[in-house]
From Swiss-Prot:
Keywords per UniProt: Chloroplast, mRNA processing, Plastid, RNA-binding, tRNA processing
Keyword Iron belongs to the record: no
GO MF term list: RNA binding
Organism: Saxifraga cernua (Nodding saxifrage)
Highest classification ranks of the organism: Eukaryota, Viridiplantae, Streptophyta, Embryophyta, Tracheophyta
Subcellular location(s) per record: Plastid, Chloroplast
This protein's name: Maturase K
Function: Usually encoded in the trnK tRNA gene intron. Probably assists in splicing its own and other chloroplast group II introns.
GO BP annotation list: mRNA processing; tRNA processing
């Protein structure tokens, strides 16, 4: 039991008080010259330009600390002010610095994964670092029911902060994130849907920060699905070598099953061989299985309770639609048509 319980303990590396001191440290620019990060994609990544570099953030903070917040120039009277400064510029710059440093744990985990595997395709987009790639199998003939789960569920700002608390214990950093989210104008409308504007987690001016928050949210949301795929003896994973997040969350879910089964024995039989298939395509989680409608309905309510009680991810059963795969296979067909499959050459020799 102790072996399973240890997975509930957060990784010590992920619990370091790293974020807030680094942002306001005098020598934050040293991050831009770090050897480990430079040899990967943090510096050369698309979108990581001079506007969001650690050096620029350091200079910005130094400039803010030297200025008098009560002095407002007459030329800037029409500009929006935040603590006496240009709100749009300064809050955006600090949010960029927050994101750059917040991505360090994910990047370092990628570095350690590469050192073990020695070979990995170079990523040109930071979104893929902490976004779990969908599980894929080519054969769907054995599946008969599919559940569509619309994601992301409209996220409240506090739920976003609570999600980050699972791997970041630095209270100062969480307060800074909460301050940025609530102080920046119209950020609530980007996360909480309004009648005039649909829900969206991505901001054009602060896309990097919102992608980081969104992927952290989805990473928690999807953890249970990859556990189910690995549990199924009929659906071995075909693309799990470089997905270091899967190992981390798989340990957590496995421990939860072992510990929770003592208090809730009926839960254990759900995990024996779920025979499930999961993909994420166009904002939906598609979960297919060779099961009866009753079993799929049980899974629907179990997943909702699991997300709400253990991952602080709020969802509702009405957002999960169950259909027969024969009448609802368009999502799978569209997903497969957009994925480039690597054909393998098989050589055969006839025996005389």
């Amino acid at each position: 039991m102790g072996e399973f319980r240890r997975y509930f303990e957060l990784d010590k590396f992920l619990q370091q008080d790293f974020l807030y001191p680094l942002i306001f440290h005098e020598y934050i620019y040293a991050l831009a010259h770090d050897h480990v990060l430079n040899r990967f994609i943090l510096v050369d990544n698309f979108g990581y330009d001079n506007k969001s570099s650690s050096l620029m953030v350091k200079r910005l903070i130094t400039r803010m600390s030297q200025q008098n917040p009560l002095l407002i120039s007459a030329n800037d009277s029409n500009x929006k002010k935040w603590l006496g400064h240009n709100k749009n510029l300064y809050s955006q710059m600090i949010s960029e610095g927050f994101t750059v440093i917040g991505e360090i744990p994910f990047s370092l985990r990628l570095v350690s994964s590469v050192e073990r595997k020695e070979e990995i395709g170079k990523s040109h987009n930071l979104r893929s670092i902490h976004s779990l790639f969908p599980f894929l199998e080519d054969n769907f003939v054995h599946l008969n029911y599919v559940s569509d789960i619309l994601i992301p569920y409209p996220i409240h700002l506090e739920i976003v902060v609570q999600t980050l608390r699972s791997w970041l214990k630095d209270a100062s950093s969480l307060h800074l994130l909460r301050f940025l989210l609530y102080e920046y104008q119209n950020w609530n409308s980007l996360i909480i849907p309004t009648p005039k504007k649909p829900s969206s987690i991505v901001s054009k001016r602060n896309q990097r920060l919102f992608l980081f928050l969104y992927n952290s949210y989805v990473c928690e949301y999807e953890s249970i699905f990859f556990f189910l795929c690995n549990q199924s003896s009929h659906l071995p994973s075909t693309s799990s070598e470089t997905l270091f997040e899967r190992t981390f969350f798989h340990g957590k879910i496995k421990a939860l099953v072992e510990v929770g089964s003592n208090d809730f024995p009926p839960v254990r039989w759900l995990f024996k061989d779920p025979f499930m298939h999961y993909v994420r395509y166009q904002g939906k989680s598609i979960l297919a299985s060779k099961s009866t409608p009753l079993l799929m309905d049980k899974w629907k309510y179990y997943l909702v309770n699991f997300w709400q009680c253990h991952l602080y991810v709020w969802s509702k059963p009405v957002r999960i639609h169950m259909n027969q795969l024969s009448n609802h296979s368009f999502g799978f067909l569209g997903y497969l048509s957009s994925v480039r499959l690597n054909p393998s050459v098989v050589r055969s020799q006839m025996l005389e």
